[in-house]
Amino acid sequence: VKIKLTVNGLQVEAHYHDDEIENVHKPLLQQLAKIHAANPQRRTIVFLCAPPGTGKSTLTTFWEYLCAQDPCLPEIQTLPMDGFHHYNSWLDAHNLRAYKGAPETFDVDKLAQNLRQIREGEGFWPQYDRQKHDPVEEAIRVTAPMVIVEGNWLLRDDERWRALAEFCDYSLFIRAPANALRMRLVGRKLAGGLSQADAEAFYERTDGPNVRRVLEDSLSADLMLEMTLEGAYRTA
């Protein structure tokens, strides 16, 4: 299946094989529907944790599309974790702006407050503005009965991040070969206009360490997916 999706405000053409849709994505969404049906009066919160470069945003947008096509599946809404970056003013004061994206650059307490709020009723969610390079508060109205919170550090094995587990009804993790992620992430920077040398330097300074930390320091999830070298997904 070839499909045009709007991901983070940009048009993306995504490709998914029919057998992958039938054997991986639809069964996963049916499982999430069962979890929601067991407690339908409360919003279901799913964590999708994965290293950079695994296509989280495109994948969850595709899941939104699949749910909209199937009346047996609940409406889902993707909530990216990027809006919980500390503001640049805070990062500058703590000499962390060069490491933006690392777990230390996120406001975990604020994330916990928002998760508590949306679990109990309708609420709002911040969004990361890629032009301003800062969060915009209350940019997303949370209305769906099921939300997928996606980010790199949601299952991080660290005291402050582990505390988020109380808000999670089901967790997903995507593993991928580190060399495949390197190719994808360097390619992303090249497409954004960086030179080969600058793109590789950015990977070594920021994306590469984050990939290693996610793959090495994350807790087990309820369901593990694997991304292949070709960018397809399968159940681990």
What does each model-identified segment do?
Residues 137, 159-162, 190-236:
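Small-molecule kinase domains that catalyze NTP-dependent phosphoryl transfer to phosphate-bearing small molecules
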Residues 56:
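Conserved lysine of the Walker
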Residues 59:
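Hydrophobic positions on the alpha1 helix immediately C-terminal to the Walker A/P-loop
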